Amino acid sequence: MTEEHRLISAESVTEGHPDKVCDQISDAILDDLLVQDPSSHVAVETSAATGVFLVFGEVTSKGYCDVQSKVRETLRNIGYTSSEVGLDADSCGVVVAITEQSAEINQGVARLTGDQETAASREERYEAQGAGDQGVMFGYATDETPTLMPLPIYLAHRLAFRLTEVRKSGEVPHLRPDGKTQVTIEYDDNDKPVRLDTVLISTQHDPEVTQDWLAVELKKHVIDPVLDEVLGSKVPHDNYRQLVNPTGSFILGGPAADAGLTGRKIIVDTYGGAAHHGGGAFSGKDPSKVDRSAAYATRWVAKNIVAAGLAHKVEIQIAYAIGVADPVSVNVETFGTEQGVTRGQIAAAVRKVFDLRPAAIIDELDLKRPIYLKTAAYGHFGRTDVEFPWEKTDKVEELKAAIAAE
């Protein structure tokens, strides 16, 4: 590797990782409430320890969620079905401490209710719904992969997803739910990926498994298929370092080995460290929370900019004040990669094309639907196994037209 080249890494985790277990429980509860009442206001956190879960937070909804049943259902779907793997969904403890949303917070988010909302025009609704909290959110896109995601996090997610696939299908026997992946990519001085450097997989397994056997099976059934699919002939990967369970055995995993908490994998959820993060987590939050909806919206904006060929990569920063509909700031950063336009022209086009008030985002991306459990593992962005509305590139022509009209 030359002095001008650099190594960039990103990690992912499987759905059986303790923090991801908590994310999925929180989003499963959110989805259940949105099915019954799309206007539910939800902020639900989950924490996990050995054999016990605490579900807590605030909910205002016309719906009802049987939290105990939802926790157990989620755990069973992940694969925690016996004490042998470290957790039995049917016998673990579940403690629930959920209260109503603060009236002071609600008054800035839901100024129109009932008949008022029904009678209001779209513009009145958009102005009436302020942000659910203050905060700064970021969205990012880059043309280094077809999904417009950074290659390290995209590849790490694909490996984690495939690891779970072969576990659940039995293609690789003796695997257990907990697992992590990490990828290191070499970039040249033009910020182009030029070589795969390292693939790391740590996976929980049955006691009878040897590490040598596991390394062979994972290379055959997980690593090689994913590398061929994602990298193909575009990025050399014939001489990389493979690490599988580098500390040795990994029998005890999940919440039995490490405590879990909702919102503790925010870099895994987003861009793997390639972009800034405002700090707000996603899971368990309904779309009135701009931590979630605005992060989705900024990804949507960024992806359309790159898809339109206006820049090779772009980061969007947006900020809100609680109870105020319009963003207090929107910033566009293209890192000097803009193509035939200025950064200022792109920023002006964004302001013209995208309405980034919370209610407008919710309407445009249709966010009051039960789509969130699927986001809670393997990344919220750049997915190929499921379609999310913030991944659509439906504003490409409008952006081009806005710039042409300047």
Curated annotation (Swiss-Prot):
Keyword Kinase: no
GO biological process, one term: S-adenosylmethionine biosynthetic process
Pfam families: S-AdoMet_synt_C, S-AdoMet_synt_M, S-AdoMet_synt_N
Binding-site residues for ATP, renumbered to this chain: H17, D178, G179, K180, D258, R264, K265, A281, K285
Cofactor note as given: Binds 2 divalent ions per subunit. Binds 1 potassium ion per subunit.
Keywords: ATP-binding, Cytoplasm, Magnesium, Metal-binding, Nucleotide-binding, One-carbon metabolism, Potassium, Transferase
Chemical reaction(s) catalysed: L-methionine + ATP + H2O = S-adenosyl-L-methionine + phosphate + diphosphate
The EC number(s) this enzyme carries: 2.5.1.6
Gene Ontology MF terms: ATP binding; magnesium ion binding; methionine adenosyltransferase activity
Subcellular location: Cytoplasm
Residues the entry annotates as binding L-methionine: E58, Q101, D258, K289
Cross-referenced SUPFAM superfamilies: S-adenosylmethionine synthetase (SSF55973)
GO cellular component: cytoplasm
Residues that coordinate or bind Mg(2+): D19
Similarity remark: Belongs to the AdoMet synthase family.
Name of the protein described by the UniProt record: S-adenosylmethionine synthase
Organism expressing this protein natively: Bifidobacterium longum subsp. infantis (strain ATCC 15697 / DSM 20088 / JCM 1222 / NCTC 11817 / S12)
Name of the gene encoding the protein in the UniProt record: metK
